[in-house]
Curated annotation (Swiss-Prot):
Gene Ontology biological process terms in this record: cellular response to estrogen stimulus; response to estradiol
Organs and tissues of expression: Expressed in liver, ovary and, to a lesser extent, in muscle, intestine, skin, kidney and heart.
Protein name as it appears in the record: Vitellogenin
Annotated glycosylation sites: 198
Domain VWFD: 1-136
UniProt keyword terms in alphabetical order: Glycoprotein, Storage protein
Origin species: Takifugu pardalis
């Protein structure tokens, strides 16, 4: 597993979980630092070869390269301006996540974790963000994916309607508020405004329901939380 996150000053951190090894690549004084299972490896000790697993970590140009071809990872590279992930040929079609299946197919590349396809690249990218379990954990993003209600009423099939997104939208956890947002276009399923159906019933299986219209919604990209969250 390769995971990427931004810290509170928008610097990128990469975490690689491969075999039983945990590798962290992170910004350090204008360069890239590296930790293996929580222990920092000094630059003068690179290249590093793991004693039991075929993993090599070395300096490459202005960044750090992690190579483990026997485990499916051709290279993970990171420097202060860029990052990339490459898998070996025999992993093509077996991957998932932000980079897709790596099989060259382009018509179904925007498949979200729930199995549904989206037409929107931003919605697709957001769908692969790991939801936080607690708003008190500073190492997590403090956001979750949720269906949202369209703020305005819409007229659908001649009826005033309430509409709910069939695609998940990033939202801050309870007790937190957004400090950075972006606009995304998502599909909405609508029910008559005077319907007796309550919100929980509408949201049950919402991601498989028909799309009645597409509208913009605010996605929360960064959140600040109260001490009592």
């Amino acid at each position: 597993i390769v995971m990427l996150k931004n810290d509170n000053v928008e610097q990128k951190h990469i975490n690689i979980k491969i075999a039983d090894i945990d590798i962290d690549l992170f910004p350090k004084s204008g360069n890239i630092g590296v930790k293996v299972n929580g222990v920092e490896i000094p630059m003068e000790n690179l290249p590093y070869y793991h004693p039991t697993v075929k993993i090599q970590i070395r300096q490459k140009g202005e960044g750090i390269s992690v190579v483990a071809p026997s485990l499916g990872l051709s290279e993970v590279y990171m420097d202060s301006k860029s990052w990339k992930v490459e898998v070996v040929d025999w992993m093509k079609g077996q991957t998932c996540g932000l980079c897709g299946k790596a099989d060259g197919e382009i018509k179904q590349e925007f498949r979200m974790p729930n199995g549904h396809l989206t037409k929107n690249a931003v919605t697709y990218a957001h769908s692969w963000i790991l939801a936080a379990e607690s708003c008190r954990d500073n190492s997590e993003c403090r956001i979750k994916l949720d269906s949202v209600e369209l703020e305005k009423r819409a007229v659908i099939y001649g009826q005033e309607s309430r509409c709910f997104s069939v695609e998940p939208v990033l939202r801050c956890l309870p007790g937190c508020f957004p400090v950075k947002t972006t606009s995304v276009t998502v599909g909405f399923h609508c029910v008559a405004a005077d319907s007796n159906v309550n919100k929980s019933e509408v949201l049950r299986g919402i991601q498989g329901k028909r799309v009645d219209l597409r509208e913009k919604a605010d996605a929360h990209l960064a959140c600040s939380c109260t001490a009592q969250c």
